[in-house]
Amino acid sequence: VTTTDATRDTGRQPRLQADHDAPDATGPDRATALLAAMTLDEKAAQLVGYWLDQTGVVAPMQGEMAAAADGRTLADITRDGIGQFTRVYGTRPVEPDDRAAWLWAEQRRLKRETRLGIPALVHEECLTGLAAWKAATFPTPLAWGAAFDPALVEQVGAAIGASMRQLGVHQGLAPVLDVVRDPRWGRVDECIGEDPYLVGTVGTAYVRGLQAAGVDATLKHFLGYSASQAGRNHAPVHVGAREVADVYLPPFVMALRDGGARSVMNSYAEIDGVPVAANGELLTGLLRDDLGFDGTVVADYFSVAFLEVMHGIAADRGDAAALALEAGIDVELPTGDAYLAPLVERVRSGLVDETLVDRAVLRVLRQKERLGLLDPQAFEDEPPTGIDLDTPLHRSLAKQLAARSLVLLSNHDVPAGTPVLPLRAGASVAVIGPNADRAEALQGCYSFANHVLASHPDLPLGFAIPTVREAMVDALGDDAVRSAAGCAVTGSDRAGFADAVAVAAASDVAVVVVGDQAGLFGRGTVGEGNDTESLDLPGVQRSLVEAVVATGTPTVMVLLTGRPYAIGWALDGDAGADHGAGGSLRPAAVVQAFFPGEEGGTAIADLLTGAASPSGRLPVSLPRAAGAQPYTYLHPRLGGPSDVTAADSTPVRPFGFGLGYTTFAYEELTVDASVPSDGWFDASVTVRNTGAHAGEDVVQLYGHDVHGSVTRPEVQLLGYARVALAAGESTRVRFRVPVQRFAFTDRRMRRVVEPGDVQVWVASHAAASRPGGTVPAGGIVASGGGAVRRPVPGSATSRATVEVTGPVHEVTLDDPRVVEWEVG
């Protein structure tokens, strides 16, 4: 080992040459060689992040948990090295060029001035695009689910990853693979949907895209976070092991095994009294031993310290560090509150085995080695300049994803005898509502605008985001559009109603844009920490819509939200009331947009004017009431409405629902008669565009296990395909289905496929069923309390029966999980 004069008399270990020539740092296993040369302090330093800018509120209890400033320089703080830099671009607004220059210089300093010369890994949030100033904002993940288009999401992930890698960022804290169960939870907009297969296929596509650009994806939140009690953030999770295995785990299995995800983040929650951050059965036994994961597990921000201050299972930070490290958390984020001095003291006193530290450090070093951080030339090039984080490619992809995510929920005839949408040429339009002219309303909780920039109100967004009003003016001309806000998103002030009503009455059509404001921890109506007890639209927005409808002007309600709301009044009216003049409560049309991002306003204008046809489908059920939650369409027979309860959990609109400007029919379903329990079967259907306009359909293949050894869902999405057809055109869609799609966890807690009959059919949504088709018989009827229910539009084939033959098949990780499909 070569020493330098600067370290000879410091009492510290001699400094290694920065090119890693010693010890064997250019050999086949540089990580192992570096680990062998490390002091305990240097090891601990690799297991933590350092947060340079702890301003604003972007993490739970950030103010309480933030380390006190100690006056030391960054060089002194990182004298032993550092594992990660926390959000150097994403904590406050910084010019990308300036920050890149700083980062390159800082990485070179780490290489030259620390003994081991190891650069820091840089992580950033990237759920709706890189969460940095002037970076493109894509639709929120709930919109990814609504698009039912994994290939497009993969392209979006690749574009996000390219921006991050250009800036010297190595790890992205996305995607969220939590399965939605309760729309009252504030973090629903970060999720993809309520179906594990949809979450898994779309989430895996994002992982592939991000990692193809050289950025490690981080799967979160492992495991069961979205099942928190009553939709309350961080609340205890009370789900059984079978539900964990069959609902919450499959998306992670897909993203790990099929997507090759390289990092995982723990859930904040506790399951059956054990916080996940201290649960070795999950983080090591399940994740590593059973699933074969060999990447890094990073702590959700402050979750190691939360073992002490929130969960109360650790006496102090050192105790928390010991619990988390033993459970399997390799890296403490965002800072080293527990894994630095408290952990080092525990190791030196013999209370923690140093081999646990070595295990985590080796994983970190191997990640850095794979990402090129141990290469001699790392950060020796010039930092990027003229950085553009919102290129034409970003905007094109953002618009495509936004357009495919918009869900048309209703579109009734107006007195002229035609549906109100698309708007007729030459119509004057009133654009009304609290979200009609606010760029923030188009963006999700983890967008930079709502996550960080809300704490810097004097700064601009940094790039163009046309609002719905601005996009309508662009589409129709200034003279054709009138506008009024009417009210705010929250509060009870109705002073603006009169202006809104006047503008609507003077127009041919009114477009009322309502919904949410995303934010964190009380700053907004949805987002992290913004859970709700009610699923009514916030504030007086419903009253605003009703006041506009009462003018008699045909009214389109556009929802810009991060969760599904209980809007049965807008879709079905009260007790059978129809749309029309005379004070009816029901708008002529309703469009659901889950925070559609920077091109969302333009995509909405295109849909309203007919420049694009709606093709999004609901990734979550639209709830009837808050009291019916939690809910999922994936329920067994007694999980739905029945004659043994007066409560009706039937959603207002089901999973997979969505209308267009044309209609589709499904014909000639053919399905293999039998399949071995470890095999594949084919299902083919003709899809016909029966309307007068071109359009895209999401063809949904559903199934039902008729008799299982445990209760099974009445309806289960098996696979899906997006198909574009001209008016009158038809095509054949073939699904190739691994019978593993019917797998479940049996009474012995094995994941199996059992022999017996299963039903298979194609439908336009989860509740669509052909009249006279095969349905369960006897005893199960919706009571509904006598409420009038309008039928939900939809079409379906009859159900075909497939016999699964052979012995019980115990599913392995090598079994196929994904349905293949082809068109033509």
Give each language-model segment a name:
Residues 1-748, 754-762, 766, 823-824:
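Glycoside hydrolase catalytic-domain context in secreted enzymes
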Residues 738-815, 820:
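Terminal connector regions
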